[in-house]
Amino acid sequence: IKAHLKMSNAKEAVVIGGGFIGVEMAENFAELSGVNTTLVEAASHILPPVDKETAAFAHNEMRKHGINLILSDAVTEFGSNEIRLSSGRRIPYDIAVLAIGVKPETSLALACGIQTGKSGGIKVNKFMQTSDENIYAGGDSVEVEGFVTGEEILVPLAGPANRQGRIIADNIAGYKSTYKKSLGSAVVKVFDLTIASAGCSEETLLKRNIPYLKTFTFGFSHASYYPGATRTMYKLLFNKEGDILGIQAAGYEGVEKRVDVMAASMRNGLKVWELIDLELCYAPPYSSAKDPVNILGMHADNILKGFVKPAFIEDIDNAMLIDIRSKAEFERETINGAVNIFTPELRERYKELPRDKKIILFCNTGFQSYVASRILIQRGFDNVYSLAAGITLYKELVKDKLFNAEKVLMQPM
Protein backbone atom coordinates (compact mmCIF):
# COMPACT_ATOMS: atom_id res chain seq x y z
CA ILE A 1 0.00 0.00 0.00
CA LYS A 2 2.82 2.41 0.87
CA ALA A 3 4.52 1.62 -2.44
CA HIS A 4 1.29 2.30 -4.34
CA LEU A 5 0.78 5.59 -2.54
CA LYS A 6 4.30 6.66 -3.39
CA MET A 7 4.13 5.60 -7.05
CA SER A 8 0.67 7.02 -7.71
CA ASN A 9 1.17 10.20 -5.66
CA ALA A 10 -2.23 9.47 -4.09
CA LYS A 11 -3.76 12.29 -2.04
CA GLU A 12 -7.18 10.87 -1.10
CA ALA A 13 -7.50 7.61 0.87
CA VAL A 14 -10.85 6.09 1.85
CA VAL A 15 -11.31 3.24 4.32
CA ILE A 16 -14.65 1.41 4.24
CA GLY A 17 -15.53 -0.13 7.61
CA GLY A 18 -15.00 1.03 11.19
CA GLY A 19 -13.91 -2.17 12.88
CA PHE A 20 -10.46 -2.63 14.41
CA ILE A 21 -8.76 -3.17 11.04
CA GLY A 22 -10.51 -0.19 9.45
CA VAL A 23 -9.57 2.12 12.33
CA GLU A 24 -5.94 0.97 12.25
CA MET A 25 -5.79 1.44 8.46
CA ALA A 26 -7.26 4.95 8.72
CA GLU A 27 -4.71 5.87 11.39
CA ASN A 28 -1.84 4.67 9.21
CA PHE A 29 -3.08 6.63 6.20
CA ALA A 30 -3.51 9.75 8.33
CA GLU A 31 0.05 9.47 9.64
CA LEU A 32 1.38 9.75 6.08
CA SER A 33 1.96 13.37 5.18
CA GLY A 34 -0.09 14.70 2.31
CA VAL A 35 -2.79 11.98 2.40
CA ASN A 36 -6.34 13.07 3.24
CA THR A 37 -8.12 10.20 4.96
CA THR A 38 -11.84 9.38 5.12
CA LEU A 39 -13.40 6.50 7.05
CA VAL A 40 -16.93 5.41 6.10
CA GLU A 41 -19.03 3.32 8.51
CA ALA A 42 -22.62 2.25 7.85
CA ALA A 43 -23.43 1.94 11.58
CA SER A 44 -23.92 4.91 13.90
CA HIS A 45 -20.51 4.40 15.51
CA ILE A 46 -17.22 2.64 14.86
CA LEU A 47 -15.77 -0.28 16.88
CA PRO A 48 -18.78 -2.67 17.15
CA PRO A 49 -17.66 -4.41 20.39
CA VAL A 50 -18.20 -1.18 22.37
CA ASP A 51 -21.15 1.16 22.85
CA LYS A 52 -21.68 4.66 21.47
CA GLU A 53 -20.36 6.42 24.58
CA THR A 54 -17.03 4.59 24.41
CA ALA A 55 -16.84 4.94 20.63
CA ALA A 56 -17.38 8.71 21.01
CA PHE A 57 -13.88 8.99 22.47
CA ALA A 58 -12.47 7.24 19.40
CA HIS A 59 -14.53 9.45 17.07
CA ASN A 60 -13.18 12.60 18.70
CA GLU A 61 -9.60 11.31 18.68
CA MET A 62 -9.78 10.48 14.98
CA ARG A 63 -11.26 13.86 14.08
CA LYS A 64 -8.56 15.55 16.18
CA HIS A 65 -5.99 13.88 13.93
CA GLY A 66 -7.67 15.06 10.75
CA ILE A 67 -9.69 12.01 9.71
CA ASN A 68 -12.97 12.73 7.94
CA LEU A 69 -15.37 10.38 9.74
CA ILE A 70 -18.63 9.52 7.97
CA LEU A 71 -21.12 7.52 10.05
CA SER A 72 -24.58 6.03 9.33
CA ASP A 73 -23.80 6.04 5.62
CA ALA A 74 -22.97 3.13 3.32
CA VAL A 75 -21.09 2.79 0.05
CA THR A 76 -23.37 2.08 -2.91
CA GLU A 77 -21.02 2.47 -5.86
CA PHE A 78 -17.38 2.91 -6.81
CA GLY A 79 -16.68 5.28 -9.67
CA SER A 80 -13.33 5.76 -11.38
CA ASN A 81 -12.34 8.55 -9.00
CA GLU A 82 -15.19 8.90 -6.51
CA ILE A 83 -17.24 6.78 -4.13
CA ARG A 84 -21.01 7.22 -3.92
CA LEU A 85 -22.82 6.78 -0.61
CA SER A 86 -26.43 5.90 0.20
CA SER A 87 -27.00 9.50 1.32
CA GLY A 88 -26.11 10.69 -2.18
CA ARG A 89 -22.81 12.09 -0.98
CA ARG A 90 -19.75 11.63 -3.23
CA ILE A 91 -16.21 11.23 -1.93
CA PRO A 92 -13.09 11.55 -4.09
CA TYR A 93 -10.50 8.79 -3.76
CA ASP A 94 -7.17 7.68 -5.16
CA ILE A 95 -7.01 4.52 -3.05
CA ALA A 96 -9.73 2.64 -1.15
CA VAL A 97 -9.40 -0.14 1.41
CA LEU A 98 -12.32 -2.45 2.21
CA ALA A 99 -12.30 -3.41 5.90
CA ILE A 100 -15.95 -4.41 6.10
CA GLY A 101 -15.82 -7.37 8.42
CA VAL A 102 -15.03 -11.06 8.29
CA LYS A 103 -17.06 -14.05 7.22
CA PRO A 104 -15.87 -17.52 8.25
CA GLU A 105 -14.25 -19.47 5.42
CA THR A 106 -15.92 -22.87 5.80
CA SER A 107 -16.01 -24.20 2.23
CA LEU A 108 -13.65 -27.10 3.03
CA ALA A 109 -15.67 -28.04 6.13
CA LEU A 110 -18.94 -27.94 4.19
CA ALA A 111 -17.44 -30.06 1.43
CA CYS A 112 -16.57 -32.64 4.11
CA GLY A 113 -20.13 -32.63 5.46
CA ILE A 114 -19.16 -30.88 8.70
CA GLN A 115 -21.95 -28.97 10.46
CA THR A 116 -21.97 -25.18 10.72
CA GLY A 117 -24.00 -23.01 13.09
CA LYS A 118 -26.31 -20.00 12.88
CA SER A 119 -23.45 -17.56 12.39
CA GLY A 120 -21.97 -19.65 9.59
CA GLY A 121 -19.05 -20.82 11.72
CA ILE A 122 -18.03 -24.43 12.21
CA LYS A 123 -19.74 -26.11 15.16
CA VAL A 124 -17.31 -27.60 17.67
CA ASN A 125 -17.58 -29.14 21.12
CA LYS A 126 -15.51 -28.19 24.16
CA PHE A 127 -12.65 -30.38 22.87
CA MET A 128 -12.70 -28.42 19.57
CA GLN A 129 -14.02 -31.47 17.71
CA THR A 130 -16.35 -30.90 14.77
CA SER A 131 -19.40 -33.02 13.94
CA ASP A 132 -16.83 -35.52 12.67
CA GLU A 133 -15.01 -36.47 15.87
CA ASN A 134 -11.82 -37.17 13.94
CA ILE A 135 -11.65 -33.63 12.60
CA TYR A 136 -10.80 -30.65 14.81
CA ALA A 137 -11.24 -26.96 14.02
CA GLY A 138 -10.15 -23.71 15.63
CA GLY A 139 -9.62 -20.03 14.96
CA ASP A 140 -11.75 -17.43 13.23
CA SER A 141 -13.97 -19.96 11.47
CA VAL A 142 -15.39 -21.73 14.55
CA GLU A 143 -18.31 -20.93 16.82
CA VAL A 144 -17.65 -20.85 20.56
CA GLU A 145 -19.91 -20.24 23.54
CA GLY A 146 -20.14 -16.64 24.70
CA PHE A 147 -19.29 -16.18 28.39
CA VAL A 148 -22.24 -13.91 29.21
CA THR A 149 -24.98 -14.89 26.76
CA GLY A 150 -24.26 -18.61 26.49
CA GLU A 151 -24.94 -18.30 22.76
CA GLU A 152 -22.66 -19.57 20.02
CA ILE A 153 -20.60 -16.67 18.67
CA LEU A 154 -17.69 -15.96 16.35
CA VAL A 155 -14.59 -14.53 18.06
CA PRO A 156 -12.07 -13.61 15.33
CA LEU A 157 -9.21 -12.81 17.71
CA ALA A 158 -5.65 -14.14 17.84
CA GLY A 159 -5.63 -14.95 21.57
CA PRO A 160 -8.54 -17.42 21.52
CA ALA A 161 -7.27 -18.93 18.25
CA ASN A 162 -3.87 -19.66 19.81
CA ARG A 163 -5.43 -21.29 22.87
CA GLN A 164 -7.68 -23.39 20.64
CA GLY A 165 -4.63 -24.60 18.71
CA ARG A 166 -3.00 -25.76 21.94
CA ILE A 167 -6.21 -27.50 23.07
CA ILE A 168 -6.50 -29.30 19.73
CA ALA A 169 -2.87 -30.47 19.99
CA ASP A 170 -3.47 -31.70 23.55
CA ASN A 171 -6.52 -33.72 22.54
CA ILE A 172 -4.84 -35.22 19.48
CA ALA A 173 -1.97 -36.28 21.77
CA GLY A 174 -4.39 -37.90 24.20
CA TYR A 175 -4.49 -35.18 26.89
CA LYS A 176 -8.05 -34.06 27.51
CA SER A 177 -8.14 -30.26 27.30
CA THR A 178 -11.26 -28.14 26.94
CA TYR A 179 -11.98 -24.65 25.66
CA LYS A 180 -13.88 -22.46 28.09
CA LYS A 181 -16.43 -19.82 27.15
CA SER A 182 -15.12 -16.72 25.40
CA LEU A 183 -15.15 -13.18 26.82
CA GLY A 184 -14.00 -11.57 23.59
CA SER A 185 -11.45 -9.40 25.40
CA ALA A 186 -10.05 -6.89 22.91
CA VAL A 187 -7.98 -3.72 22.68
CA VAL A 188 -7.27 -1.24 19.90
CA LYS A 189 -4.97 1.76 19.52
CA VAL A 190 -6.57 4.90 18.06
CA PHE A 191 -3.66 7.31 17.66
CA ASP A 192 -2.75 8.19 21.28
CA LEU A 193 -5.99 6.73 22.67
CA THR A 194 -6.60 3.15 23.82
CA ILE A 195 -10.02 1.48 23.69
CA ALA A 196 -10.48 -1.88 25.43
CA SER A 197 -13.42 -4.11 26.31
CA ALA A 198 -14.42 -7.53 27.62
CA GLY A 199 -17.77 -9.28 27.88
CA CYS A 200 -20.98 -7.89 26.43
CA SER A 201 -21.80 -4.37 25.29
CA GLU A 202 -25.05 -2.69 26.30
CA GLU A 203 -26.23 -3.00 22.69
CA THR A 204 -25.75 -6.79 22.84
CA LEU A 205 -27.55 -7.09 26.18
CA LEU A 206 -30.50 -5.11 24.80
CA LYS A 207 -30.70 -7.30 21.69
CA ARG A 208 -30.63 -10.46 23.81
CA ASN A 209 -33.16 -9.11 26.36
CA ILE A 210 -30.67 -9.71 29.18
CA PRO A 211 -31.49 -7.56 32.26
CA TYR A 212 -28.65 -5.28 33.31
CA LEU A 213 -27.59 -2.24 35.30
CA LYS A 214 -24.84 0.15 34.28
CA THR A 215 -22.59 2.89 35.53
CA PHE A 216 -19.85 5.14 34.19
CA THR A 217 -16.87 6.53 36.02
CA PHE A 218 -13.58 8.26 35.37
CA GLY A 219 -10.36 7.10 36.99
CA PHE A 220 -6.84 8.50 36.82
CA SER A 221 -4.16 6.37 35.16
CA HIS A 222 -2.06 6.83 38.31
CA ALA A 223 -2.14 9.05 41.40
CA SER A 224 -3.49 12.43 40.31
CA TYR A 225 -0.78 14.34 42.19
CA TYR A 226 1.99 12.46 40.34
CA PRO A 227 2.95 14.18 37.05
CA GLY A 228 1.38 12.96 33.82
CA ALA A 229 -1.85 11.49 35.18
CA THR A 230 -4.64 11.18 32.60
CA ARG A 231 -8.30 10.26 32.96
CA THR A 232 -9.82 7.02 31.68
CA MET A 233 -13.55 6.56 31.15
CA TYR A 234 -14.99 3.22 32.29
CA LYS A 235 -18.39 1.75 31.51
CA LEU A 236 -19.45 -1.17 33.71
CA LEU A 237 -22.39 -3.46 32.96
CA PHE A 238 -23.67 -5.80 35.67
CA ASN A 239 -26.89 -7.32 36.98
CA LYS A 240 -28.81 -7.13 40.24
CA GLU A 241 -27.17 -10.37 41.39
CA GLY A 242 -23.78 -8.66 41.13
CA ASP A 243 -22.50 -10.56 38.09
CA ILE A 244 -20.17 -8.57 35.82
CA LEU A 245 -21.58 -8.59 32.29
CA GLY A 246 -19.19 -6.27 30.49
CA ILE A 247 -16.51 -3.62 30.80
CA GLN A 248 -15.39 -0.90 28.39
CA ALA A 249 -12.69 1.72 28.79
CA ALA A 250 -11.25 4.64 26.83
CA GLY A 251 -8.12 6.51 27.86
CA TYR A 252 -4.42 7.13 27.35
CA GLU A 253 -2.58 5.05 29.95
CA GLY A 254 -3.24 1.86 31.90
CA VAL A 255 -6.48 1.15 30.03
CA GLU A 256 -5.80 -2.45 28.99
CA LYS A 257 -4.36 -3.22 32.46
CA ARG A 258 -7.68 -2.47 34.15
CA VAL A 259 -9.74 -4.26 31.50
CA ASP A 260 -7.49 -7.32 31.86
CA VAL A 261 -8.14 -7.33 35.62
CA MET A 262 -11.87 -7.07 34.95
CA ALA A 263 -11.72 -9.89 32.39
CA ALA A 264 -9.90 -12.12 34.89
CA SER A 265 -12.49 -11.20 37.54
CA MET A 266 -15.33 -12.13 35.19
CA ARG A 267 -13.65 -15.40 34.25
CA ASN A 268 -13.34 -16.34 37.93
CA GLY A 269 -16.92 -15.41 38.81
CA LEU A 270 -16.24 -12.42 41.06
CA LYS A 271 -19.22 -10.30 42.02
CA VAL A 272 -19.00 -6.54 41.56
CA TRP A 273 -18.62 -5.92 45.30
CA GLU A 274 -15.64 -8.30 45.40
CA LEU A 275 -13.77 -5.89 43.11
CA ILE A 276 -13.51 -3.60 46.14
CA ASP A 277 -11.23 -6.09 47.91
CA LEU A 278 -8.81 -6.79 45.06
CA GLU A 279 -5.24 -6.02 46.17
CA LEU A 280 -3.63 -4.49 43.10
CA CYS A 281 -0.16 -3.01 42.66
CA TYR A 282 0.10 0.54 43.96
CA ALA A 283 2.71 3.25 43.81
CA PRO A 284 1.96 6.84 42.73
CA PRO A 285 3.55 6.46 39.25
CA TYR A 286 1.36 3.41 38.51
CA SER A 287 -2.01 3.68 40.22
CA SER A 288 -3.96 5.20 43.10
CA ALA A 289 -4.48 3.81 46.58
CA LYS A 290 -7.99 2.97 45.39
CA ASP A 291 -7.43 1.58 41.90
CA PRO A 292 -10.07 2.35 39.24
CA VAL A 293 -11.07 -1.34 39.42
CA ASN A 294 -11.78 -0.94 43.16
CA ILE A 295 -13.74 2.24 42.41
CA LEU A 296 -15.85 0.42 39.81
CA GLY A 297 -16.75 -2.13 42.48
CA MET A 298 -17.70 0.65 44.90
CA HIS A 299 -19.89 2.35 42.29
CA ALA A 300 -21.78 -0.85 41.51
CA ASP A 301 -22.06 -1.80 45.19
CA ASN A 302 -23.54 1.62 46.04
CA ILE A 303 -26.14 1.21 43.29
CA LEU A 304 -27.09 -2.31 44.39
CA LYS A 305 -27.41 -1.20 48.03
CA GLY A 306 -29.65 1.70 47.04
CA PHE A 307 -27.21 4.35 48.24
CA VAL A 308 -27.47 6.18 44.91
CA LYS A 309 -29.59 6.10 41.77
CA PRO A 310 -27.54 6.77 38.62
CA ALA A 311 -28.81 8.92 35.76
CA PHE A 312 -27.45 9.06 32.25
CA ILE A 313 -27.34 11.59 29.44
CA GLU A 314 -30.47 10.15 27.85
CA ASP A 315 -32.37 10.79 31.11
CA ILE A 316 -32.00 14.57 31.25
CA ASP A 317 -35.25 15.33 29.41
CA ASN A 318 -38.06 16.43 31.75
CA ALA A 319 -35.76 16.43 34.79
CA MET A 320 -34.64 19.28 37.00
CA LEU A 321 -30.87 19.62 36.51
CA ILE A 322 -28.79 20.86 39.43
CA ASP A 323 -25.13 21.71 38.98
CA ILE A 324 -23.70 21.21 42.46
CA ARG A 325 -20.26 22.61 41.65
CA SER A 326 -19.02 26.03 42.72
CA LYS A 327 -20.43 29.22 41.23
CA ALA A 328 -17.17 29.83 39.34
CA GLU A 329 -17.33 26.38 37.70
CA PHE A 330 -21.01 26.84 36.90
CA GLU A 331 -20.40 30.21 35.27
CA ARG A 332 -17.58 28.78 33.18
CA GLU A 333 -19.73 26.02 31.62
CA THR A 334 -22.76 23.94 32.48
CA ILE A 335 -25.58 21.93 30.94
CA ASN A 336 -28.28 23.99 29.30
CA GLY A 337 -31.13 24.66 31.75
CA ALA A 338 -29.24 23.69 34.90
CA VAL A 339 -29.63 25.49 38.25
CA ASN A 340 -26.59 26.03 40.47
CA ILE A 341 -26.70 24.94 44.12
CA PHE A 342 -23.21 24.36 45.54
CA THR A 343 -22.98 21.14 47.59
CA PRO A 344 -22.19 22.90 50.93
CA GLU A 345 -25.38 24.97 50.47
CA LEU A 346 -27.68 21.96 50.04
CA ARG A 347 -28.29 21.45 53.75
CA GLU A 348 -29.79 24.95 53.89
CA ARG A 349 -31.45 25.13 50.46
CA TYR A 350 -32.94 21.64 50.09
CA LYS A 351 -36.43 23.02 50.81
CA GLU A 352 -36.30 24.85 47.46
CA LEU A 353 -36.35 21.53 45.62
CA PRO A 354 -39.49 19.72 44.42
CA ARG A 355 -40.28 16.24 45.68
CA ASP A 356 -42.61 15.38 42.80
CA LYS A 357 -40.16 15.82 39.90
CA LYS A 358 -37.05 13.91 38.88
CA ILE A 359 -33.92 15.74 40.06
CA ILE A 360 -30.56 15.01 38.43
CA LEU A 361 -27.48 16.28 40.23
CA PHE A 362 -24.19 16.60 38.39
CA CYS A 363 -20.58 17.65 38.95
CA ASN A 364 -17.36 17.11 36.99
CA THR A 365 -17.09 13.31 37.16
CA GLY A 366 -19.77 12.07 39.57
CA PHE A 367 -18.18 12.01 43.03
CA GLN A 368 -19.58 15.27 44.41
CA SER A 369 -23.01 14.58 42.91
CA TYR A 370 -22.98 11.26 44.79
CA VAL A 371 -22.27 13.13 48.04
CA ALA A 372 -24.99 15.67 47.23
CA SER A 373 -27.52 12.96 46.45
CA ARG A 374 -26.81 11.32 49.82
CA ILE A 375 -27.50 14.65 51.56
CA LEU A 376 -30.90 14.86 49.88
CA ILE A 377 -31.77 11.17 50.30
CA GLN A 378 -31.12 11.51 54.03
CA ARG A 379 -33.67 14.33 54.03
CA GLY A 380 -36.35 12.09 52.57
CA PHE A 381 -35.94 12.72 48.84
CA ASP A 382 -36.56 9.62 46.71
CA ASN A 383 -36.55 11.46 43.37
CA VAL A 384 -32.84 12.28 43.31
CA TYR A 385 -30.32 10.90 40.80
CA SER A 386 -26.60 11.38 40.23
CA LEU A 387 -25.39 11.89 36.65
CA ALA A 388 -22.88 9.09 36.06
CA ALA A 389 -19.42 10.42 35.07
CA GLY A 390 -20.77 13.97 35.24
CA ILE A 391 -20.20 16.84 32.86
CA THR A 392 -16.86 15.38 31.70
CA LEU A 393 -18.55 12.49 29.89
CA TYR A 394 -21.36 14.80 28.81
CA LYS A 395 -18.90 17.14 27.06
CA GLU A 396 -17.25 14.26 25.21
CA LEU A 397 -20.62 13.07 23.90
CA VAL A 398 -21.68 16.58 22.92
CA LYS A 399 -18.41 17.00 21.02
CA ASP A 400 -19.28 13.84 19.08
CA LYS A 401 -22.81 15.22 18.43
CA LEU A 402 -24.39 12.04 19.79
CA PHE A 403 -27.40 13.94 21.08
CA ASN A 404 -29.79 16.61 19.84
CA ALA A 405 -27.95 19.93 20.16
CA GLU A 406 -31.07 21.67 21.47
CA LYS A 407 -31.15 19.35 24.45
CA VAL A 408 -27.46 19.26 25.24
CA LEU A 409 -26.03 22.56 24.08
CA MET A 410 -23.19 23.74 26.30
CA GLN A 411 -23.92 27.28 27.50
CA PRO A 412 -21.27 29.56 29.02
CA MET A 413 -23.10 31.69 31.56
Ranges and model annotations:
Residues W273-M320, S326-I360, N364-M413:
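Rhodanese-like catalytic fold shared by cysteine-dependent sulfurtransferases
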Residues I1-S8, N81-R84, R90-I167, V261, ...:
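FAD-site-proximal beta/loop scaffold in flavoenzymes
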Residues V15-I16, L361:
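Hydrophobic Val/Ile/Leu positions in short beta-strands of Rossmann-like dinucleotide-binding domains
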Residues E12-V14, F20-E77, L157-P160, Y179-E203, ...:
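Rossmann-like dinucleotide-binding cores of NAD(P)H-dependent redox enzymes
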Residues E253-V272:
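A short, polar/charged loop-to-alpha-helix boundary motif
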